[in-house]
Amino acid sequence: MDFDSISRESTFLSPLLNQNAMWQMNLGSDDTMGVDGSYPERHGEPDCAYYIRTGLCRFGSTCRFNHPHDRKLVIATARIKGEYPERIGQPECEFYLKTGTCKFGVTCKFHHPRNKAGIDGSVSVNVLSYPLRPNEDDCSYFLRIGQCKFGGTCKFNHPQTQSTNLMVSVRGSPVYSALQSLTGQPSYSWSRTSFVANPPRLQDPSGFASGSQGGLFSSGFHSGNSVPLGFYALPRENVFPERPGQPECQFYMKTGDCKFGTVCKFHHPRDRQTPPPDCVLSSVGLPLRPGEPLCVFYSRYGICKFGPSCKFDHPMRVFTYNNNTASPSPSSSLHQETAITTELRNLLVSSSVEAKPTSLPETTSAKDTIVDAQH
């Protein structure tokens, strides 16, 4: 019985083995046809992608696609013309639909319809040439810094920027916003050096030094309930998002600034009521807190971006700046006057010393004349 079962299995497997052997023979003959260049040329049919890519075709003479004799010439021509294969029935090339190009060229196995080249990528752009995709999520990187490294290929939305204040060096600083409103120039063109080159000179609590910037400030102190005049009382544009259904941003409500900018998830009401300061304000609108530490930024540059809400002390005193364009300090003026007085005194002494030899001969000659007259 064992021999009968073996013979039956061999009889059953023989057609499969013969078919497999015939397929291998056909494959070998196809390779030979590929070497000889005897693949069928079917003009009017799409090119065989596998043949164009490898130079071989497993279907041989039964392949229904075209097999050009010089496939390298076909590849070069397609690159020059920018043509891509149309393979009806195959999935469409997503990269081709988005950009209108395909790095695989004629060897791509997907369909490239000519009337849909770059149709998905034809979207409107904002003022910075980034794509506007209303149905997609906002690009967090673009909202945070105002740029996007992916450019036109980014799949997220890039909303229009409502203000150029996002590009300032110190975001949310009322000083830079005030400078923009006064000069009419973009605030980001003001560097720290150019602003501090000729700062206001604070002299005495009873008044403020007159100068080119004197019109921006008022003299005297301000009570806690009064609104200070100066840089910090000037209006500025609100560039933070308003989200009515969300909680209010506590940092924004307290200081008027928000480090997260347009990506903050909290509400930033435009009509924010500034709480009255809990201390006396100086003539430039900065808080005087004698028991608190000195504001480092104010001590260096004479300004403070937090304004009346700063928790440090901003005393009124004379600032000395190491800048040629800055106003000279009283100590330097006194030193210059002392030097001038010393030079004048030395000049007078030297002139008197030089005058003595000229006067002595005259006196001597007069005495000699008197003596001669007596004799």
Swiss-Prot record:
Gene Ontology cellular component annotations, sorted alphabetically: nucleus
Gene3D superfamilies: 2.30.30.1190, Zinc finger, CCCH-type
Compartments in which it is found: Nucleus
Source organism of this protein record: Arabidopsis thaliana
Name of this protein: Zinc finger CCCH domain-containing protein 57
Swiss-Prot/TrEMBL keywords: DNA-binding, Metal-binding, Nucleus, Repeat, Zinc, Zinc-finger
GO terms, molecular function: DNA binding; mRNA binding; nuclease activity; zinc ion binding
Coarse class of the protein's main subcellular location: nucleus
Annotated spans, Disordered: 352-375
Classification via InterPro entries: Plant_ZF_CCCH, Znf_CCCH, Znf_CCCH_sf
ZnF (C3H1-type) residues: 42-70, 87-115, 133-161, 243-271, 289-317
